[in-house]
A protein has these predicted regions:
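Active-site beta-strand termini and strand-to-loop segments that position acidic
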Residues: 80-82
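Polybasic/polar functional segments that serve as interface/processing modules
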Residues: 1-33, 45-78, 90-94, 100-115
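Catalytic metal-binding acidic patch
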Residues: 35-37
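Short hydrophobic/aromatic beta-strand micro-patches
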Residues: 39-41
Length: 115
């Protein structure tokens, strides 16, 4: 699956699961370990875990399994690595603290739309 299609499927899964403040960054010019980063907030640790589950279920339906899935024990910040796309799912307070959008600010913002 192409990175752009993977990005769209993950974005749609987040929209369907009511992810908040979803941002998509094209980081191909900034790093070589991934093409896109998707950052989204959940209202609680449980919601963050639900967002992660929804992404993994959707991608499994498409025949893709994550390379890695980290942070579920606490649920404040869950990272799911699909190689070409990395999803960061966080509670708003954690997102404010780490401010990944600023850290990866050299990446280009991608305007994604839900189906």
């Amino acid at each position: 699956m192409q990175a752009e299609q993977m990005r769209q499927e993950i974005y749609q899964a987040l929209v369907d699961a009511k992810g908040q403040d979803i941002k998509v960054l094209d980081v191909r010019k900034v790093t070589d370990f991934t093409d896109y980063m998707i950052i989204a907030s959940g209202t609680s640790s449980r919601h963050v875990q639900t967002l992660a589950d929804k992404i993994c279920v959707r991608m499994k339906e498409l025949g893709l399994m994550p390379i890695g899935r980290e942070g579920e024990a606490v649920g404040d910040w869950v990272l799911i690595d699909f190689g070409d796309v990395v999803a960061h799912l966080m509670r708003p307070q954690v997102r404010d603290l780490y401010n990944l959008e600023k850290l990866w600010g050299d990446g280009e913002r991608v305007e994604a739309t839900a189906k």
